[in-house]
Amino acid sequence: MQLKIQLLMLVLMTVLTDVYSKDGFIVSKKNCLYRCSQSDERGFCNAVCLRYDADSGYCRTGKCWCDGLPQKANIAMKNKSYC
């Protein structure tokens, strides 16, 4: 019985984490994307993303991509242009 409860809690925590976080290219307060170099092995982008309360970040196609951002975070939309 104890094992079943622990497994249920694990599943619920996983589902809730996915629901309450999002991933994407982070947009600054000035409505700009953070540019980066592909050779930046998680350094700059990870630091930027952590400032926005993300789990981690890395350089993807020359822009900072953040994983595990809070729902309130401003991420880039496909049909919008940024500075």
Swiss-Prot record:
Residues 1-21 form the signal peptide. It is found in: Secreted. One of its GO terms (molecular function) is sodium channel inhibitor activity. Its main location: secreted. Keywords: Disulfide bond, Ion channel impairing toxin, Neurotoxin, Secreted, Signal, Toxin, Voltage-gated sodium channel impairing toxin. Expressed by the venom gland. One of its GO terms (cellular component) is extracellular region. CDD domains: neurotoxins_LC_scorpion (cd23106). The keyword Secreted applies. Transmembrane segments: none annotated. The keyword Electron transport does not apply. Belongs to the long (4 C-C) scorpion toxin superfamily. Sodium channel inhibitor family. Alpha subfamily. Has the structural arrangement of an alpha-helix connected to antiparallel beta-sheets by disulfide bonds (CS-alpha/beta). This is Neurotoxin LmNaTx35.1.
